[in-house]
């Protein structure tokens, strides 16, 4: 048995010959092409690092936008927390929603650049395990210094984030071990 695809609507027909008419869109037999077994090939898909080798000014703009979008995520979430403290939960939710949209923008810049993400999940997980370990250590050092200088609020907040980084790293390590070791 062969497979035939309607180039108009994408319908796949299995048989010895293409049908006289597409049952979905009504296109004639001449609009069917035989499909060779090529796996799951897609007509197009997102690719990591398409900006590699582009004009220097464009590259700098992409990097600046990535940094800006990441910064906005943090700012908007902080603003959401403040709005909640002042009793404006709807404002807080708007900030959170917009922060997520800014995070999506940042992720697209990251994909274009291909500098902080690669086209391999195992490698991405390992990079994050390593990065979260470093972030945990850096925050622990900062928290310790803040405590030494009697900046209790700074110590408490940064120390809690240090523990969050350890939790993140453990989660990534668990996924790495489950899927790739």
Swiss-Prot record:
Residues 52-181 form the Ferritin-like diiron domain. GO terms for biological process: cellular response to alkaline pH; cellular response to cold; cellular response to heat; cellular response to hydrogen peroxide; cellular response to oxygen levels; cellular response to salt stress; hydrogen peroxide catabolic process. It catalyses: H2O2 + NADH + H(+) = NAD(+) + 2 H2O. One of its GO terms (molecular function) is NADH peroxidase activity. Its EC number is 1.11.1.1. Residues 1-35 form the Rubredoxin-like domain. Gene3D superfamilies: 1.20.1260.10, 2.20.28.10. Induction: Up-regulated by heat and oxidative stress (exposure to air, O(2) and H(2)O(2)) (at mRNA and protein levels). Various other environmental stress conditions such as an increase of the pH of the growth medium from 4.5 to 6.2, addition of the salt NaCl or of the solvent butanol, and lowering the incubation temperature also result in transiently increased transcript levels. Is also expressed under non-stressful conditions. Repressed by PerR. The keyword NAD applies. Binds 3 Fe(3+) ions per subunit. Fe cation 1 binds at residues 6, 9, 22, 25. SUPFAM superfamilies: Ferritin-like, Rubredoxin-like. Fe cation 3 binds at residues 102, 132, 165, 168. Pfam families: Rubrerythrin, RUBY_RBDX. Keywords: Detoxification, Electron transport, Iron, Metal-binding, NAD, Oxidoreductase, Peroxidase, Stress response, Transport. Its cofactor is Fe(3+). Fe cation 2 binds at residues 69, 102, 165. Homodimer. This protein has been named 'reverse' rubrerythrin (revRbr) because the order of the two functional domains is reversed compared to 'classical' rubrerythrins: the rubredoxin-like FeS4 domain is located at the N-terminus and the ferritin-like diiron domain at the C-terminus. Functions as the terminal component of an NADH peroxidase (NADH:H(2)O(2) oxidoreductase) when using NADH:rubredoxin oxidoreductase (NROR) and rubredoxin (Rd) as electron transport intermediaries from NADH to revRbr 1. Plays an important role in the oxidative stress defense system in C.acetobutylicum, an obligate anaerobic bacterium. Also exhibits NADH oxidase (NADH:O(2) oxidoreductase) activity in vitro, which is 100-fold lesser than that of FprA1/2 using the same electron transfer components. This is Reverse rubrerythrin-1. It comes from Clostridium acetobutylicum (strain ATCC 824 / DSM 792 / JCM 1419 / IAM 19013 / LMG 5710 / NBRC 13948 / NRRL B-527 / VKM B-1787 / 2291 / W). The gene is rbr3A.
